[in-house]
A protein has these predicted regions:
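Juxtacatalytic substrate-recognition/specificity segment
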Residues: 117-244, 248, 252-274
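Exoplasmic/lumenal beta-rich domain surfaces
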Residues: 460-512, 545, 560-568, 574-587
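Beta/coil-rich, acidic/histidine-enriched accessory regions frequently appended to metallopeptidases
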Residues: 21, 25, 29-31, 36-49, ...
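Extracellular beta-strand-rich recognition modules
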Residues: 440-446, 513-520, 546, 604
């Protein structure tokens, strides 16, 4: 860590006012002149055409309730769901576990033996696996005595887990593709999720983790926090949840991994998103960890505890906590990307407990003039350093909007969007009268990008006023159910562009029905979502392209949209000197110009809600005109 002094210079942009005319003083007229009555009938003004406006994107999307969904879709009967009787365990007993094979996207069953029993934990070992039993016992006892209390103090002072058992279970076995995991599915009855173990389980892969090591305890602490967070705020954004889990390792006094270094080697990594390919997530872990560590060090334990317990998600939870400081999530993010470069010990721009390397430069500017056309992810940063012999004139311009997913609706300007998030249940519903037809066909256009085999969209019909629903089969929907998340014929994965879907409604001809589109996501990772346009039922003359509004469809989580959100920018410079000077702009008009000296670092960051689409910008480095 470097010990420097920082001077923050606020910058006010003076933007030109266009098309503004200052009126001359009004002439005073003492009496109004007589206006004769016209001898003709004036032509009435035409009725104005109302142009619809997109709905605002909600802060929170509806949270899924798998029990309610199972009843509504006829998977289980209404009424109380039996829960297993809490069991008393003893060393040497055996039990069968459902375990996920992540690379193969499937569950398998295996038998394990109870090896270690403490006040709060039952540690099981998969049958036939060699393991150092003494090292396992020492690790579990150390976790119980030292690590468990530290994590509970920060993340859940009152144990929130409604245990169907007498302990928290730790499965130690061979688990392909991961070091460990926690699954919220185990909190449900097997009637609701077919692969539930019906008890709280932390899964550790002893193929890559050795009991008795810091690494084993770190992964155990990491997954234990995920368990706690599921019960405290189960629909929290994945990037926040993962940051909390890494902070659990750090707060417990365990060494943190090299993910921070991986992130700083790729600082153009979106903080607020998570890839659905686990092999690409290592820099994301680093971003989440450094951001949470920065927040914890700057605002303290109490603020961090309030953040953990906030019912809001993602940036909104930070805004809630930071409001008392007069700050926003964007303010904190802007300070953080400066801290990642300066790492100053004595100011808000650095870390006290960590010593991360500098972020990788996007480019070093060694000659001028030069113009760069670049992209940067939302809530990420590109770093440039001026290494010329003379001052330069910087000119920046960037796009003012960004898309949520597809480049445009299938037709016109408007469409519906499912929203996105973890543990989401969004619906879009409309009544239809099919009484006067003996045949009916639903047609619609869709563009979707959903976490394959984990997140699904369904098309449903109800003929009893919405009490019960049936999932309909489409051309591209699938009944494959490798992970247990597919409730019927679901759309999942990627459509590869706008596609036409067709569903037979003839079994409901002659009836009044409700049609519904429903997005249901699991508890981690989400993609752009499901977009919907141009719905038709030709047999009853129904066609809706949504260019005049909602068209009678009632959303609960779905958003009426043009697919575009405002693109924000934060441009910052660090000017070398003693002390260094930090300048910051949030431009709303382009181009932005600034004269910069050799040695100056420029940081370009983009911010837009919800989307994971990158932002485009231009940076021109030019000679300073003479006289400036």
């Amino acid at each position: 860590m470097k010990k420097v002094f920082i001077l923050l210079v606020p910058v006010v942009l003076l933007l030109p006012i266009l098309g503004c005319v200052v009126p001359s003083p009004a002439t005073v007229v003492p009496f109004a002149p007589h206006v004769p009555t016209p001898c003709f009938t004036p032509t009435p003004s035409p009725t104005p055409i109302l142009i619809p406006a997109p709905d605002p994107i909600p802060q929170e999307f509806p949270v899924r309730d798998l029990a309610e969904i199972a009843v509504r879709l006829g998977k289980i009967p209404p009424g109380p769901i039996p829960t297993p009787t809490p069991a008393l365990h003893h060393p040497g007993e055996e039990a069968i576990f459902w375990v996920v094979d992540h690379p193969a996207t499937r569950y398998f069953t295996t038998t394990a033996e109870l090896s270690v029993l403490t006040a709060n934990f039952c540690a099981w070992v998969e049958r036939g696996r060699e393991i150092d039993r003494k090292a396992l016992k020492d690790s579990i006892r150390r976790f119980e005595a030292e690590i468990y209390p530290r994590i509970m103090e920060i993340f859940s002072p009152q144990f929130p887990i409604p245990l169907n058992d007498s302990c928290i279970h730790i499965f130690n076995g061979l688990i392909p593709g991961v070091g460990g995991y926690f699954s919220g599915s185990d909190a449900y009855s097997r009637q609701i999720h077919q692969y539930s173990n019906e008890k709280p389980v932390l899964y550790l892969n002893i193929g890559s983790l050795k009991p008795g090591t810091e690494h084993y305890l770190s992964v155990l602490a990491h997954e234990f926090q995920h368990m706690l967070q599921w019960y405290v705020d189960r629909n929290e954004d994945t990037w926040v949840n993962e940051g909390f889990s890494q902070m659990a390792e750090f707060i417990a006094g365990l060494s943190y991994n090299g993910s921070a270094r991986a992130f700083l080697a790729q600082p153009d990594t979106q903080l607020t998103s998570w890839p659905d390919d686990p092999g690409k997530a290592y820099p994301n872990y680093g971003a989440s960890f450094l951001f949470m560590a920065y927040f914890y060090e700057r605002f303290g334990k109490e603020a961090f505890q309030n953040l953990v317990r906030s019912p809001l998600n993602g940036p909104h939870s930070f805004n809630e906590i930071l409001a008392s400081q007069g700050l926003s999530f964007e303010d904190l993010f802007a300070d953080w990307v400066i801290a990642n470069y300066l790492d100053d010990l004595d100011s808000k721009y650095g870390y006290r407990e960590l010593d991360p390397p500098k972020p990788q430069l996007t480019a070093a500017i060694t000659f001028i003039p030069i113009t760069l056309t670049e992209t940067v992810h939302q809530y990420a940063a590109d770093y440039f350093k001026i290494q010329t012999e003379e001052p330069v004139l910087l000119r920046f311009s960037g796009n003012l909007t960004v898309t949520l997913g597809p480049q445009s609706p299938y037709s016109g300007k408007f469409m519906w969007w499912s929203g996105r998030g973890d543990e989401v249940d969004s619906t879009l519903t409309r009544p239809f009268n099919l009484k006067n037809t003996n045949k009916a066909t639903l047609r619609f256009r869709t563009w979707y990008d959903l976490e394959k085999d984990y997140d699904y969209v369904y098309v449903e019909v109800s003929s009893d006023g919405g009490n019960t629903w049936k999932i309909l089969r489409g051309i591209r929907s699938s009944e494959d159910n490798p992970i247990g998340n597919n409730l019927g014929y679901g759309y999942t994965g990627k459509s590869g562009g706008w596609v036409e879907e067709e569903i037979d409604l003839t079994p409901w001809a002659g009836k009044e029905i409700l049609l519904r589109f429903e997005l249901i996501t699991d508890d981690a990772v989400n993609n752009p979502g499901f977009f919907l346009d141009d719905i038709a039922i030709p047999e009853i003359g129904y066609y809706e392209d949504f260019e005049r509004g909602h068209g009678g469809w009632v959303p609960n989580g779905f958003v009426y949209t043009d697919g575009i959100v405002k693109q924000g920018w934060i441009i910052q410079v660090i000017e070398s000197g003693k002390p260094p000077v930090v300048r910051r702009w949030k431009p709303v008009d382009f181009p932005l110009e600034a004269k910069l000296n050799p040695g100056t670092v420029i940081i370009v960051s983009a911010f837009a809600p919800v989307t994971s689409e990158p932002a485009f910008y231009n940076l021109a480095f030019m000679h300073v005109p003479s006289g400036q």
